[in-house]
């Protein structure tokens, strides 16, 4: 894993519920490799059981080489009846822990189609950050991913 640094590569962490502590140890052991946690670390949104996930996310976010993709939240909720309000506690927590500088919006497409349509997920994510500044929203929905993955910008400044 540490050889990724030599090639300027990063690593996306696709975990199962309960594996955030293992990822945290990997991130700790590879301080010069950037890691993107997918699906906000797979909290139990459906049952509104966010502990110990909250503490695990805070511990992971303490490492500056750890980033978090705000994806998969709808698929972690009740597929039939989720509302944006159901997702907000988990989404707010990752933004609180990682900040906008290290949190990137992700679609989780096509998997998210099992829980919702793409426009509904985008609306829920936008709703979750409705009180944030334009600069913070731009960071979340564009800049963090551009910077992390080395993509060409698609938004004008």
What are these model-predicted stretches?
Residues 1-104, 152-157:
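Catalytic pocket-lining loop regions of alpha/beta-barrel enzymes
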Residues 9, 43, 80, 111, ...:
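Residues at structural and domain junctions
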Residues 75-76, 111-113:
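Short, active-site-adjacent cap segments at secondary-structure transitions
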Residues 92-93, 97-104, 113-157:
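Mid-to-C-terminal alpha-helical segments outside catalytic/metal-binding sites
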Residues 108:
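Active-site glycine-centered loops adjacent to acidic/histidine catalytic or metal-binding residues
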């Amino acid at each position: 894993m540490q050889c990724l640094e030599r090639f300027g590569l990063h690593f996306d962490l696709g975990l199962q519920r309960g594996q955030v502590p293992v990822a945290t140890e990997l991130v700790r052991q590879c301080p010069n490799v950037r890691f993107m946690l997918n699906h906000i670390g797979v909290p139990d949104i459906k049952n509104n059981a966010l502990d110990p996930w909250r503490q695990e996310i805070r511990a992971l976010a303490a490492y500056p080489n750890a980033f978090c993709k705000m994806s998969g939240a709808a698929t972690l909720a009740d597929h039939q009846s989720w509302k944006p309000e159901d997702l907000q506690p988990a989404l707010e927590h990752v933004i609180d822990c990682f900040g906008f500088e290290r949190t990137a919006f992700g679609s989780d497409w096509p998997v998210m189609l099992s829980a919702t349509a793409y426009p509904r997920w985008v609306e829920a994510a936008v709703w979750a950050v409705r009180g944030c500044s334009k600069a913070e929203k731009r960071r979340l929905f564009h800049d963090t991913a551009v910077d992390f993955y080395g993509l060409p910008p698609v938004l004008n400044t």
